[in-house]
């Protein structure tokens, strides 16, 4: 879960936990919280349609990059971070206005077919100097989705199940999960 869905303190505590048990921490869709990154053992950067924290320096410093195509709790939907959760630090990381709703698109405009996804995987691999590139999908039409993802030749695929959580789902979805 992203910084915004979870507090700064929670994100840092989870990162410290990953260091203690030597596992990976994912940024979530909200960009890179520097203190979380510094305290994690391995750090997976979630590459999302809004392109939060995307620059060559960040792509080179993370352990891996995960392209978010889908998320279990909100398959086919974008995100919504309510204005009251958009602090000064969150606004800065996301490049958004303080105390305004942050709406995340449901998909990448530049990915319309398998070749577009393959091109993005290749581009991110090059820009990150060879970091592993993954693709995150929601568990929906699994065989079709896996075929699409595999065609891009990622290093890993994350299948996100419905039972997961997010602070950015529409209220009707959160209430039903």
Q: What role is predicted for each listed range?
A:
Residues 1-105, 116:
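N-terminal capping/small domains of soluble enzymes
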Residues 105-177:
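Glycine-rich phosphate/ribose-binding loops and adjacent secondary-structure elements
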């Amino acid at each position: 879960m992203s910084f915004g869905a979870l507090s700064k303190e929670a994100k840092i505590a989870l990162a410290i936990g990953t260091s203690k048990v030597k596992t990976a921490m994912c940024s979530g869709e909200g960009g890179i919280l520097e203190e979380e990154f510094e305290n994690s053992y391995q750090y997976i950067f979630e590459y999302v349609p809004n392109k939060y924290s995307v620059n060559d320096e960040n792509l080179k410093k993370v352990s891996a990059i995960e392209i978010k195509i889908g998320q279990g709790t909100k398959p086919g939907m974008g995100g919504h971070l309510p204005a009251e959760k958009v602090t000064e630090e969150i606004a800065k990381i996301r490049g958004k206005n303080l105390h305004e709703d942050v709406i995340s698109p449901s998909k990448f405009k530049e990915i319309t077919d398998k070749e577009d996804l393959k091109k993005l995987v290749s581009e991110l691999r090059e820009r990150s100097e060879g970091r592993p590139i993954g693709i995150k999908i929601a568990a929906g039409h699994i065989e079709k989705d896996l075929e699409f993802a595999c065609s891009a030749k990622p290093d890993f695929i994350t299948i996100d199940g419905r039972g997961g959580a997010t602070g950015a789902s529409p209220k009707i979805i959160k209430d039903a999960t």
